[in-house]
C-alpha cells in the first residue's frame, strides 16, 4: 500500500495494492495492522454506503463532540472528496484538501476526527463507502456551507445538486468557536 501525505496533517491518500488479471482484480480495503502502521487509528465502529447521481454534492459535515474519523472510498464511479480543517487553534484552520477517488484508481482518503468532510459526484453515478470511528449522532452534527467564500473550495462542478439541509448551513466564520473541535483535543 502506498501512503501519500496531503497538505493537511493527518489527512492521507491511500493507494492499496491491486492484484489484477483477465478475470478482474482483488484488493484489500482494510487491514488493522497495515492501516495502523500507516497512521490510521481505529477502531472503526460503523460502515456506511451512499449512492448518488452526477452533480450531487454532500457536505460539509462533521460531528462534535464525538468526532468521527473516516476512511472513504468509491466502489463505483468517481467523486471529488474534500476535507476541511475546522479545529480551532490548528495551524491549518480553514484550509482544505481535495482528491479524486474512483473505482479506477482505487484510492482511499482518511479524514481524521475534527475535520469537516464533503464530496461531489463527477461520474453518472457513484457508490461511496466510508468507515467511521464513532457512531452517527445527529445531536452533535455540525454543517458548514459547501460554497463558503472564505473556504473557496473548487468543487470541479458548476451547478451542484445540494440537499435543502446542506444548502442552508452557516459559513465557518458564523459558527461559534466553542461549537467546533479544538486542535489537540480530537
Task: Describe the predicted segments one by one.
Residues 109, 117-122:
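Short beta-strand His + acidic residue motifs that chelate non-heme Fe in jelly-roll/DSBH
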Residues 1-107, 123-125, 130-186:
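Non-catalytic, conserved peripheral segments adjacent to functional cores
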